[in-house]
């Protein structure tokens, strides 16, 4: 358990946010006017390394030249070009093709599952998505969700998984023991040598919990799965949100390193001043 792990005497500082959405939830072309506030906010909260990971359905807005210009203007920061690939039944095929075509320009690809039965609505939409769970077999929904996660991992296109237990967002819990389901999923993650994120976004959602939950974090640590830190910011003011709280959580688990990415190559950096 976390209490049995070695604990640093003080919470460790966090320096990277690897889940951000400058475009929000619509196509917006990358410009300096759009991106510079993110660099300013990163600097203000003490971040040194950030990854832009807009949803793949908005890839038309991503301009690598603009990211390069931003890097030139903010050389004290490490700014990564990334994207979040999900299982959007309408757009993800085009998103995967775009990622393959621009693989060498990307530093980082997040993978996530936002869609279950409905092609026209993400199940994690708040509050509308909660209706997708009404009258449903929650155990079956959890099994379906993690099956889709495993399928995404097996594409070989993702460097890290986002909000691994997003299925809990509206507060629905499985009745069945899902330890084997989680274990199977994490074993594929380990075999594929990818990371998972610790996301503070869950603390501002109805579930009011970190993504993923403590038991999943423990299993991941036990399997040696690398970790990133993330806010899932959809506004630059959310960068690094609740990272002080996340630092305390990480400290309790005895985690001493988090990973960063450059051109899909992972490096683990110590959580030290």
What are these regions (language model features)?
Residues 218-273:
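Long, positively charged, glycine-interspersed low-complexity recognition regions
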Residues 13-16, 24-27, 31, 91-139, ...:
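N-proximal accessory regions
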Residues 47, 106, 157-158, 225, ...:
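A structural motif
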Residues 25, 61, 113-223:
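Domain-core and long-helix interface of multi-subunit machines
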Residues 1-89, 93-101, 160, 168-180, ...:
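An N-terminally biased module of ancient metal coordination in phosphate/nucleic-acid-related enzymes
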Residues 19, 42, 109, 163, ...:
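Conserved, mostly hydrophobic/aromatic
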């Amino acid at each position: 358990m976390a209490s049995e792990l070695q604990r640093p005497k003080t919470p460790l500082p966090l320096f990277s946010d690897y889940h951000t959405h400058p475009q929000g939830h619509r196509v917006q072309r990358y410009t300096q006017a759009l991106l510079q506030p993110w660099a300013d906010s990163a600097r203000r909260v003490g971040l040194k390394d950030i990854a832009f990971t807009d949803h793949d359905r908005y890839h038309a807005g991503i301009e690598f030249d603009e990211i390069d210009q931003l890097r030139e203007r903010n050389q004290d920061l490490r700014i990564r070009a990334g994207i979040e690939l999900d299982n959007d039944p309408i757009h993800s095929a085009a998103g995967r093709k775009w990622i393959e075509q621009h693989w060498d320009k990307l530093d980082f690809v997040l993978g996530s599952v936002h869609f279950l039965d409905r092609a026209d609505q993400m199940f994690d939409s708040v509050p509308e998505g909660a209706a997708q769970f009404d009258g449903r077999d929650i155990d079956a929904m959890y099994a379906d969700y993690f099956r889709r996660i495993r399928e995404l991992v097996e594409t070989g296109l993702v460097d890290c998984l986002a909000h691994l237990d997003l299925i809990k967002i509206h507060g629905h819990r499985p009745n069945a023991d899902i330890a084997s389901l989680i274990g199977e999923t994490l074993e594929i993650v380990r075999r594929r040598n990818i990371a998972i994120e610790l996301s503070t976004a869950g603390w501002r959602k109805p579930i009011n919990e970190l993504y993923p939950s403590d038991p999943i974090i423990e299993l991941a640590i036990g399997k040696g799965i690398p970790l990133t830190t993330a806010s899932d910011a959809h506004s630059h003011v959310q960068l690094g949100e609740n990272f002080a709280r996340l630092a305390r959580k990480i400290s309790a688990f005895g985690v001493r390193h988090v990973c960063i990415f450059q051109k899909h190559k992972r490096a683990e950096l110590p959580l030290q001043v």
